[in-house]
Amino acid sequence: MSLFDTINSGGAQLLGVAWPTVWALVRILVVAVVILLCVAYLILWERKLIGWMHVRLGPNRVGPAGLLQPIADVLKLLLKEVIHPTAASRWLYLIAPVMTVVPAFAVWAVIPFQAGAVLANINAGLLYAMAISSIGVYAVILAGWASNSKYAFLGAMRAAAQMVSYEISMGFALVLVLMTAGSLNLSEIVGSQQHGFFAGHGVNFLSWNWLPLLPVFVIYFISGIAETNRHPFDVVEGESEIVAGHMIDYSGMAFALFFLAEYINMIVISALAATLFLGGWDAPFEFLSFIPGIFWLVLKVFALLSVFIWARATFPRYRYDQIMRLGWKVFLPVCVFWVIVVGFWMMSPLNIWK
């Protein structure tokens, strides 16, 4: 009997009918706390990695090797005043940061950490993740409009256009995964990548979706960078033009909530990419399957997050028209073409997803 089964049976005996609700709340709390810790140290890892790329040390003053820097940053933001512009729509202005964070947390309900370890194992998990993650664009528009600032509104309009443009390409990428897996359940999608010729010979990583759907995987990941308004797609908050975009009038914890949502969304994009294209919790080689699946998922997510950071340190910022051109004239046609290719592939005798 596993640890979770032991806790479940013991809790059911102790609390009776109230236990399922209590157990669900405990799991949600644990996942939320872990995500917050991951965000804190993802920011530290980003600053360290970019520092090394710039041939400098990065944060190294607070705690040993700078490991307490995230705590200092949180305390600083907690002690700052939340400024409310006189001309702003007060309640909408304050609701917008909350609206960005809630969907970012809600997506984690359907992401499986390993076999059987998921908060809500629903059959429409992929559809749920896509629908919930697209709500964030409304919060960005609301923040720009409620601030009653032309610079904030300009940044919000850029964000809305960019997010909508790249959501279409991401949607097509998810449709292709749905076609090959035959299911919207994320656990079943991971399971569908554990079969085939290569998996039968112990080379699991060659049976994952990244290989047959490589162009789509690349498009999905780049679109994810654009969706999260990360460099080189960060024209929304381009420092040389409109400073912080829709966040220009925010301060303190209201400002911090936008950044919290951005980094949670980075982890969500990486976790979904690992689940849909990189086998989720599956080990790359069969002889390594004794290692818990959550270790492999965390390793894959960490590698993808490092690519996010590498892109920030490496590429210059795109112009707004270049971003739109890439989304509509390159990614969208390639995705449509690949849908047709995979459709014919699946109907042919060479179908590898049987």
Swiss-Prot record:
Please indicate if the UniProt record lists Translocase as a keyword. yes
Q: Where is the protein situated, by its record's location annotation? A: Cell inner membrane
Any one GO molecular-function label of the UniProt entry: oxidoreductase activity, acting on NAD(P)H, quinone or similar compound as acceptor
Keyword Transcription regulation annotated: no
Q: What is its main location?
A: membrane
Output the GO biological process annotations, alphabetical, semicolon-separated.
aerobic respiration
User: What is this entry's stated membrane topology?
Assistant: Multi-pass membrane protein
Report the PROSITE patterns cross-referenced here. Answer: COMPLEX1_ND1_2
Please name the top-level EC class of this enzyme.
translocase
Question: What's the stated role of this polypeptide?
Answer: NDH-1 shuttles electrons from NADH, via FMN and iron-sulfur (Fe-S) centers, to quinones in the respiratory chain. The immediate electron acceptor for the enzyme in this species is believed to be ubiquinone. Couples the redox reaction to proton translocation (for every two electrons transferred, four hydrogen ions are translocated across the cytoplasmic membrane), and thus conserves the redox energy in a proton gradient. This subunit may bind ubiquinone.
Quaternary structure (record): NDH-1 is composed of 14 different subunits. Subunits NuoA, H, J, K, L, M, N constitute the membrane sector of the complex.
The protein's name in its UniProt record: NADH-quinone oxidoreductase subunit H
Q: Which gene encodes it?
A: nuoH
